[in-house]
Amino acid sequence: GFLIGMLRLLTEKLRESIIEETKDNAGRLRHHASLGLWCGNNEMESAWDHWGGFNDHSDTLKQDYLTMFEKLIPEALKSEDDVTFYWPSSPSSGGNFKDPDSDDVGDRHYWDVWHGEKPFSDYENYYFRFCSEFGFQSFPCKKTIDTFTLPKDRNIFSEVMESHQKNGSANAKILHYIAENFLYPKDFESLIYISQVLQAIAIKSGVEHWRRNRGRCMGAIYWQLNDNWPVASWASIDYFGRWKALQYFSRHFYADVLGSLKVSADAVYTPYLQNETMQEVSSDVTVFVKNMRGEVLFETSQRTECAPLSVEAMEPVSLKEVIEGREREVFVEAVFTHSDGTVSRQVEMPKPYKHMQIEKAEITFDAKREGNLLTLQLKSDVPAFFVSVESDVDLVWSDNFMHLTGKEPYEITAILPECVEGMPKIWVRSLCDSWVTDYSQA
């Protein structure tokens, strides 16, 4: 598609160029299995409707827009690909400048979380039909930052770091959200780590809310997947292909079968089962209240079935009596065991992480290599949150940034590149390692 710009269709040569460019791209891309629809442009209808600098353009230019995106391009596409759906703009209600930012028709872009600095809970105020763009920034992985900085540059307000940040006051926004949710990071590496955790939590909050409202909302696509240079951005995979926390989280919140928790006032937790498969599934869910040593203070279980391509709300669980008076000392965990063999785990804190009495976790792991398969068995003496496993070799793990809340080992795997000999260097961090706390006084 085209991006936030419009030309006068003054000559037949320009019209022919647009048609040929459209046909060329359609022929090049139409075979891709991931192709869902063709979209004419990004945000041009919306911009024309209410952005400054667009909405005072001439009626003639507006007619040229309609000719280009609602006649020339769809006709050219149809000649090359007559089976894939065409959508004139995003967001849009279907074209012709008819309420392109409607919450009730078509697709919607939403940026009050991030640009508007609204809390993550603000997603739950909206029930769009399809949220096709929303996002949250984080810094790239530390090894990526090392490629464009010297040690003296490794401060987010250094000239080099700011030159690798193209969204105005974005670094200040990241610090704002840290202040709302976490204790201040103790060093540069911890700040990078916390920024990625924030990004993952933000997008998870939106996707799971909209998935719980399947039927009203039929899709959520976050901005963005990857980068074209090493930079702080909304991407979940950085320039060198290194996965941020968000990319690991997306494996869970976009899973075909997902268990999630809706948290309501007065400590009411409602489990939901979302099923995007063509078969009925069932799920057994256990909701726990645990203290920060991992001891179970309360648990309750239930089972539900969910039809294909649907969502099922389960019985709400009121935990007010269990939690009241010790909100800083306990957390809620839900474990969904699905009939397809997968498991969903959810952890919710009664208060922001910065106010929770999280204990210092001692995490150990056993590493084993068989051929190119690397297996890690991780254990923690107390609950450890957002556990990040890193290596001197670039690896994609089967899971990462997970919570270790039980006494049993948690296994993750990765495939080592053929060129790697022996055992790579591995290190682990969790949330409690990101700030300075005197645990001896706990």
Question: What role is predicted for each listed range?
Answer:
Residues R8-F97, I201, F240-G241:
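Active-site neighborhood of glycoside hydrolase catalytic domains
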Residues G1-S17, V83, P100-E117:
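Aromatic-lined substrate-binding rim segments of carbohydrate-active enzymes
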Residues F288-R326, D394-V420:
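Intrinsically disordered, low-complexity Pro/Gly/Ser/Thr-rich segments with frequent PxxP/GP/PP motifs
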Residues Y239, H252-S260, V343-D366:
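Long, low-complexity ectodomains and other extracytoplasmic segments of secretory-pathway proteins
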Residues E315-E359, P417-A442:
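Terminal connector regions
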Residues T277-E295, K379-W397:
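Short acidic, flexible loop segments centered on an aromatic residue
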Residues T270-E276, T375-D381, I415:
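Short edge beta-strand/loop segments characteristic of extracellular beta-sandwich folds
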Residues W38, E75-K78, W87-P100, V105, ...:
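Substrate-binding clefts and catalytic carboxylate motifs of secreted carbohydrate-active enzymes
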